[in-house]
């Protein structure tokens, strides 16, 4: 089955940190508590979401004063769901691959193969300094992350595993039991730099990119897939999007404007300063948010840029347009998570599936007439 024949998948950001997904003083009927997140996870899997992504934060800032740890929180959500796969974010440095491999293999065993990992290379030096962790320069963080991923996959698939890298070494190590998922637990990563894209094209199963226009996303997809093909590797693409689905376009745009009008200016500017400092440390001297305006930065991962804001029909058409340029998954954020996840499942997702089916039939007709 080709990429275009595969139904596009949906994930959501788990609000396991306080403050929601917008740096705004607007009312958010979203809660970082465990009870709320259990209800959200159960609603999400009933409404067509296949993945959930927990966040990893060690320090407060930009509205996130409280943060639950990602791996244990992921496991807790898996215990209360039946189908949802939860992606636990992990930072090389605080986590060592031997511990992560065993921890995740155990969770995989306990949850019948529903854990995944998002390897976060890190962009905020202040957080690493606060917890006493080494802060390698930009490209070296990706060298470390690539070794981390290679060793995880090696441990999960090989007995008597040995590895001699710059950051990690193993000698004849055998992990038992190994994960239930075959060939191994899925590995996600993000980042927009050359080093991030190159790493994705060599070792990751999934690559998350910040929100952007269809045209810009297409450029990234083509770049990564071209590199991956040269490496005899396959990687899937997920795109961040903050979804505002309402009965009318005017309602949706009014919500967006209210979010921006009520932005926490001090926190947004501080986030912008931190991202520019981080970007300047990369070889390209720009990072994920180099072209992001103040309005874009109100949503951490440029989710407004993806423009899934409007009526269910408008959003469904834009999702299929993203699929047509090679996107495999939409990583979604919402203002009021539970009620909007339910609205999405009821109003938007059926339209997406109808458009996919219609497009597939058109392709079949064209193929027969060719």
Protein language model regions, located:
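Acidic (Asp/Glu)-rich catalytic clusters
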Residues: 2-5, 42-46, 75-82, 104, ...
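An alpha-helical appendage that flanks or caps ligand/catalytic pockets
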Residues: 2-16, 131, 138-181, 212-324, ...
């Amino acid at each position: 089955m080709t990429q275009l024949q595969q139904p596009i998948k949906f994930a959501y950001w788990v609000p396991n940190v306080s403050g929601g997904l917008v740096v705004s003083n607007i009312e958010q009927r979203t809660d970082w508590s465990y009870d709320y997140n259990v209800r959200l996870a159960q609603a999400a899997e009933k409404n067509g979401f296949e993945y959930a992504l927990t966040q990893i934060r060690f320090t407060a800032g930009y509205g996130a004063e409280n943060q639950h740890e990602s791996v244990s929180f992921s496991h807790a959500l898996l215990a209360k769901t039946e189908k949802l796969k939860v992606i636990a974010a992990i930072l090389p440095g605080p986590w060592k691959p031997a511990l992560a491999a065993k921890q995740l293999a155990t969770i995989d065993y306990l949850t019948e193969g529903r854990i995944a990992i998002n390897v976060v290379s890190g962009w905020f030096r202040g957080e690493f300094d606060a917890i006493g962790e080494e802060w390698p320069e930009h490209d070296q963080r990706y060298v470390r992350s690539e070794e981390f991923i290679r060793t995880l996959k090696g441990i999960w698939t090989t007995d008597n595993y040995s590895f001699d890298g710059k950051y990690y070494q193993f000698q004849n190590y055998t992990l038992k039991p190994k994960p239930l998922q075959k060939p191994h637990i899925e590995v996600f990563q993000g980042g927009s730099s050359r080093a991030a894209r190159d790493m994705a094209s060599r070792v990751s199963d999934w690559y998350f990119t910040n929100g952007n226009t269809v045209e810009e996303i297409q450029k990234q997809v083509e770049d990564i897939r071209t590199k991956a093909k040269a490496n005899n590797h396959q990687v899937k693409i997920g795109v961040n999007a903050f979804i505002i689905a309402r009965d009318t376009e005017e309602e949706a745009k009014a919500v967006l404007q209210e979010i921006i009008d009520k932005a926490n200016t001090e926190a947004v500017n501080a986030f912008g300063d931190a991202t520019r400092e981080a970007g300047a440390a990369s070889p390209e001297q720009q990072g994920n948010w180099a072209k992001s305006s103040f309005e874009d930065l109100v949503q951490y991962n440029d989710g407004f840029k993806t423009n899934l804001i409007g009526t269910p029909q408008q959003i469904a058409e834009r999702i299929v347009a993203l699929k047509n340029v090679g996107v495999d998954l939409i990583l979604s954020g919402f203002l009021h998570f539970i009620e909007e996840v339910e609205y999405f499942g009821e109003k938007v997702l059926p339209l997406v599936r109808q458009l996919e089916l219609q497009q597939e039939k058109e392709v079949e007709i064209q193929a027969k007439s060719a």
